[in-house]
Each structure stands twice: as structure tokens, then as C-alpha cells.
Design a protein with these regions (language model features):
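Hydrophobic, small-residue-rich alpha-helical packing segments that form membrane-like cores
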Residues: 64, 71, 80, 87, ...
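Flexible glycine/proline-rich, aromatic-decorated loop/lid segments
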Residues: 3-12, 33, 74-93
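Flexible loop/turn segments at secondary-structure boundaries
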Residues: 20, 24-27, 36-38, 60-62, ...
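PLP-dependent enzyme catalytic core of the Aspartate aminotransferase-like
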Residues: 76, 90-129
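Membrane-embedded transmembrane-helix bundle of lipid-linked glycan/lipid transferases
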Residues: 28, 32, 36, 85-88, ...
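Conserved PLP-binding catalytic core of the aspartate aminotransferase-like
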Residues: 49-80
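Active-site C-terminal subdomain of aminotransferase-like
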Residues: 1-48, 52-55
Length: 129
């Protein structure tokens, strides 16, 4: 079936990738992901109306709380070509206005700055509206 073929292709790709980067390379990729995630969170919580939901160790994802509904913020970011994260409110009603964000080793400091700048603009304009 297609599902089995797709699984086989993904396993093959992952095996090739891990064999190329090796244990040391995989550790470096993980460390870079953690670093980029920390940089992303630091940049985003500096935006007025954004705060960290949980002050716990994390790998490459974090939950942020916004002072307004996440859906509108994500729509405004999407209009700027930015996939801003995942609105958690539908799956976790107790986390209203919660946004799941992620950064990996593939994100650059410029990507993070662009996201933070766009989020700051969206939050400021939404407050003025």
C-alpha cells in the first residue's frame, strides 16, 4: 500500500541522513535546534502581549500565551508569508490563546528576527484596531 511505501521511504531517508551526519553530527543538530528555539522564544517574549506559558526545559518547541486570540494573529502572520505556529486552544481548551512555536537548526537568526518583527507589528496593529 502507499502508506507502507511512504513509511519505507521515510525510514530509508532517515537512515541515510543519520549515517551521513553520524552520532556527533546528530548531537550538533540537536544542540543547534535547542539554541535556535531559545533564540526564538527570547525574541518572541520580548513582544508586548506575549509570554512563555511554561518555564520548564524544552527541546525545540515552546508554548506562548498571547493577550488576544491566536487565530487572528496566525491569519495576519500568514498574510505576510509566515507560518506562525499552532493554535492550541481547540485541542487544549484550558490553554486559550496559547501558541505552539518551534525552531530547528534550519532556522537562521534572520528568520527569527523576521518572525519576531512581524509578530510585534501584528500585535501592535491588533491592539490599535
Amino acid at each position: 500500500s502507499n502508506i507502507c511505501t511512504n513509511q519505507g521511504l521515510l525510514v530509508t531517508a532517515a537512515t541515510i541522513y543519520m549515517s551521513i551526519v553520524g552520532p556527533r553530527g546528530l548531537a550538533q543538530v540537536a544542540a543547534a535546534s535547542m539554541q535556535r528555539s531559545a533564540e526564538l522564544v527570547e525574541a518572541l517574549v520580548a513582544v508586548p502581549g506575549v509570554r512563555l506559558a511554561f518555564d520548564r526545559p524544552r527541546f525545540h518547541e515552546a508554548v506562548l500565551l498571547l493577550d488576544r486570540p491566536v487565530r487572528g494573529v496566525l491569519e495576519a502572520l500568514a498574510a505576510r508569508g509566515i507560518i506562525g505556529g499552532c493554535d492550541l486552544s481547540a485541542d487544549y481548551p484550558a490553554l486559550a490563546n496559547a501558541l505552539l512555536v518551534c525552531a530547528t537548526e534550519t532556522r537562521t537568526p534572520a528568520d527569527i528576527a523576521a518572525y519576531a518583527g512581524a509578530l510585534a507589528d501584528v500585535m501592535k496593529n491588533a491592539a490599535a484596531a
